[in-house]
Amino acid sequence: MHIVICIKQVPDSAQIRVDPVTNTIMRQGVPTIINPYDLFALEERSSCASHGGEVTVLTMGPPMAEDALRKALTVADRAVLLTERHFAGSDTLATSFALSRAIAKIGEAFGTPDIVFTAKQTIDGDTAQVGPGIAKRLDLLQLTYVAKIVSVDINGREITVERRSEGGTQTLMSKLPCLITMLEGTNEIRRGSLDDALRAARSQIVKWNAADAGIEDLTKCGLRGSPTVVKRVFAPPERAEKAEQIDTAEKTPRDLAEELIAGIFLRSGVESELAFDAN
């Protein structure tokens, strides 16, 4: 079994700043992390590990994205970094194109993947479009918003998963190969062992440019291949509302209700004329 996991190095959302002049995210000097939803994909690969095989992690980004791959290598066998200036400024369409070509090349070099994992979305873009875009380009069955891998039948070429939706949880079965987009799952995120960390530090990362990944049409990459235009990025204004705690000591339920209702009307600027019946 061969598993490919797409990850992304993103700015730590707790420390993101917006340039007031360009209205874009200021990435310089902001700590980076592995996209949190990618961690669940890395963890779920253990559900398939009993069948043997290999795990390849893939990311597209600048040379500094190697740091994220080093961390992911603690639970993977190899890492591929897709990096070149032609990829800069890619939107979801251009990103899914480049990653799909890289996955196809990974299949040629290391074996066709049985499962491709992506996060449901990244915390810097929040589009949830790249995973389905890859599946479409590679003609893969796709299982989205998956919370758990239930079972894998490698002989029968089937996988069963739990998918979370607004209506509840669904149990779905799919044929392999397929693409899975992961959201926060039920498994706890575990750290690799010290031996895993040492192995990851010594491992050689495969670095590909566009030509290495089999990309011939550069007009589909980067800004030239990105029809999406972001006009403005901004932080929402701070909300003036604050929580207020009501002291319940030695107060009757009626007193508490009256105080609560009075507070609601006071905040809305409307005078309350409601009164409780003494009975």
Curated annotation (Swiss-Prot):
PROSITE patterns: ETF_BETA. The keyword Transport applies. One of its GO terms (biological process) is nitrogen fixation. Belongs to the ETF beta-subunit/FixA family. PANTHER family: ELECTRON TRANSFER FLAVOPROTEIN BETA-SUBUNIT (PTHR21294), PROTEIN FIXA (PTHR21294:SF17). FixA and FixB form a heterodimer. May play a role in a redox process involved in nitrogen fixation. This is Protein FixA. It comes from Rhizobium leguminosarum bv. phaseoli. The gene is fixA.
